[in-house]
Amino acid sequence: FEGFTVHLLLRYTSGHKDFPDAEMNIKHTLENTARKIPHKEAIILGNRRITYGELDEVSNKVANALLKMGMQKGTHVAILMSHSPEWVINYFGVIKGGGIAVLLNTALKAPELEALLRDSDSEILITERGFSQILSPFISNIPLLKHVITVDTASYTKMIANSSSVSPDIDIKDEDEATIFYTSGVLGKQKGVVHTHASSMGTPPVVSAGIQRKREDVIIDLVPFSYLFGLFEVLFGSIIQGSTVVLIPSFTPRAFLEAVDKEKGTISFGVPAMYNALAMVRDEILERYDLSSLRLVVTAGAKSFPKLMQILEDKFNLSLYEVYGLTEVSAVSISTADSRKLGTVGKPICRLKILDDNGKATAIGEIGEAVFNAPWVMKGYYKAPDLTAQVLKDGWFYTGDLVKMDEEGYLEYIEKKSFIIVTSSGLNIGPSEVEFLLLSHPSVAEVAYVGINDGYGGQIPTAFVVLKDGQHATAEELSNLCYQNLADFKLPKRIEFIDSIPKTSSGKISRKKLKEIDLSQH
């Protein structure tokens, strides 16, 4: 698989004189691009447009202001901000000053934010006035927090105006810690994932090579930068190449279509739920927009439904590429122009083992746990060596994800082990198979198949279904569809019609919230 990665980079970079030298340092990556193309637009939000030169200069001002405030190399600086140019500016300000950025999800509630600010040992918080109400009850009680900087205030504007625009003379090494992401993906509890400068810069050039991102590309970004996929593959990958990134703070199909039309977007990054929504947009609405510039969309973060993705490709006349990865190990498998197969996540770009429950390698076509070895794996979980040891063993990262590989080397993501439904008889059901089947019904828009605890150690397989506008289907009709196509033990015991499937802030199905629904009220 290392050969496939090298092939991608060599094939793409040869003959492309604009491809910058590979950097393993976040600070130097921005500075190199800003030096080469200072007047090229870097970030766009609505009518706000920031060039690479401006991004470099203003982030220097932020860095120097933070250093004057008392930030030192290694200081933890939390960022709680909306998806905006200011987020990018302040993130790079922290990095250039030698700080470690702690990225907080804007969808978190007060108890969650308080817990993460405490756990992360953050000494500075950069935020916006819109978060003051949620922060005010507890912010003065965070023991190590010394400063709260609110960016949309006159005092912040004055602080930046009076700060030097010269890059701080801070010795930042590739192996220095750079960013802490909080995730609950693998072990089911919130924990800080620590990435260094080097681990941050491993996959962006590989993914850029795979999707053939060029300097003239305009990236439509639907993914917040507080997520690794957004920061590494969207922002860092675009900065390395010198592409322009158009931000959409809150996804709606209309916002996406308007951005592509106005900015002549060429590549989009999002999650499957967003592209599912776009696939459902009526043709007469699409005809109002010029979407001819859009050549491909990239998805990650959840399992996509091949049928809907094929509809999307046909409707928009583009290609869909999938990226599979985790916060702890970044991208590990991608689709490319040379290796694309709907229903798969392309081919691995690092070393992979697929292991059965006994730790033995599976045969081709057999399902097992994905275990990866990559140079861009996380440094570890913050202050949690025991948790790190559970998933990182002898350089191999144990994902908890079930996958299988076909005879051509394409990797198919099945689902997380934790999503498996265990019946009262002890049989295991993979939700995606049932979800795919129910989605094939012409009246069904969305499906989530989860196990509701039965009180006896097993689970009640329950399908939550959202119907398309104006369409009708009965539980009996959908049950018959399952009966005709699935083994009896896989059949839903209940089918519940709901108005919408609850999602996480990253657009994934919130199976936890579905399991909390009181079925006695339905």
Predicted features and spans:
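Conserved pre-ATP/AMP-binding loop-to-beta segment of ANL
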Residues: 23, 39, 150, 164-182, ...
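AMP-binding/adenylate-forming catalytic core of the ANL superfamily
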Residues: 108, 125, 268, 374, ...
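Conserved AMP-binding A3 loop
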Residues: 51-53, 178-202
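Conserved AMP-binding/adenylate-forming core of the ANL superfamily
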Residues: 18-26, 31, 39-84, 88-92, ...
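Gly/Ser/Thr-rich phosphate-binding loop
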Residues: 262-270, 279-342, 351, 359
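Conserved AMP-binding/adenylation subdomain of ANL enzymes
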Residues: 201-218, 226-267, 277, 281
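AMP-binding/adenylate-forming core of the ANL superfamily
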Residues: 353, 364-378, 396, 402-403
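ANL superfamily adenylate-forming
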Residues: 47, 130-174, 281-282
